[in-house]
Amino acid sequence: MYWQDRMAQSQAKLTSKSIKETEKQLIKYYSKTMETVIADFELTYQKLLNTMEQGREPTPADLYKLDKYWQLQAQLKSELTKLGDKQAELLSRKFVEQYIGIYNTMALPDELNLFSTVDKKTAQQMINQIWCADGKSWSSRIWTNTDKLQQALNDNLINCVVSGKKTTQLKDMLQSEFNVSYNRADSLVRTEMAHIQTQAAQQRYKDSGIQEVEVWADKDERRCEVCGKLHEKRYPINGVMPVPAHPRCRCTIIPVVQPNNQLMVI
């Protein structure tokens, strides 16, 4: 079991490093956008409150009459578009690095293409392949997430107007929505990284002449029932791999090596 564990750990280490680097940058993007957007929302909401006559509660209709509200909408759209663009650029770059890194990590000592590598163009094509049953690409999910965030932020603004909440309460509500959106983005990163890890490993094994692979699930307390049932199950190298089996899945695939071969982790 030694080499299987070593193989899985090698892949997991590289994937974990890629995820941490990506998350660090994502947090910066989200923090900057959140600070700018919330400040704009607070100014707009406070302006609405200041325009109300003594004792009169504002309504959504009052909000829509403000030029500041429509300026806010344009600014919000601009900020979220920049956030989405930055995410798309970051993820594209990190996913390509992940694919190349995993592909180049493993090799069989006696394979003819021991030091073969994969180029960026091929890696880019591989990471852009649609693999989920809903037919959506990872890039389209970025924009779905930003659209949801935009709607949620505006819904919370209207909610504050209707319920008469304070500006400080609005800020808390908006921060919560940004946290939800970040968690969706983080889940996307982790799930796609796992898929790319599987893709790259499968292609490397195939190029090395491996005929069969085995699913290897982490054996810690976080291993779920689904992954536990897949552990050590074997699949033909040209088949569809069952992992990642769910969002944030940590399973890997390792080659079924013939007795005369030893696995090399570069």
Mark where each language-model region is:
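N-terminal leader/targeting and assembly helices and adjacent pre-domain segments
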Residues: 1-175, 260-266
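Acidic, glycine-rich two-metal-ion catalytic cores of nucleic acid-processing enzymes
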Residues: 172, 176-266
